[in-house]
Amino acid sequence: MKEGNVVQHHGLYRSEFEHDNCGIGAIVNIKGQKSHDTVANALKIVENLEHRAGKDAEGKTGDGVGILLQVSHRFFSKVCKPLGIFLGSERDYGVGMFFFPQDELKRNQAKKIFEVIVKNEGMNFLGWREVPVKADVLGSRAVECMPCIMQGFIERPKKVKQGLDFDRRLYVVRRVFEQSSDDTYVASLSSRTIVYKGMFLVKQLRMFFEDLQNPDYESAIAVVHSRFS
């Protein structure tokens, strides 16, 4: 959307370069201290970027909204334990965010392909977690194409260093998988960061992903993006 009152010329500003664009924002704790406040405040930022977010004619489905956070060991260790997934220490595992097809057969095939690739790359696959979501907050178009959203966990090999070295190995896994499965989208795969995203209005991101509302989810950094296509 465009505002009616635009300054024509002031200093180096030139109105002819004014145009609609995506919205971005970021929060960083300079001491590296993780907290849920960082997550909550980043969500407030993106919720105030409605003027930088596209939507359909009905006004119920957005062009896309997302948030990048650090992998919260406190959160994932708690939610994975009841599933029989034991993660070990912080940064000793990678987390992937997968958008699988709703068709069960295709989904199971894609999951199996990923597990085989992880094994072939010399790593141990720990298990799957279905991400809890609230589909009733979405618009009809988003519901029609909504994937099955799952997280996959990979153990860090002892011979691979934490951080960048491990993430490089995970990147290879991701690229091989993306060439092997046309029906699945990998939003992120890392031991350090994770991405939550979808075809949301800006206020739907927080409501859709229950993980983002959990006070145990902590991060020292957060980057948000609202898409204006």
Locations of regions flagged by a protein language model:
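N-terminal segments that mediate ammonia production and transfer
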Residues: 1-229
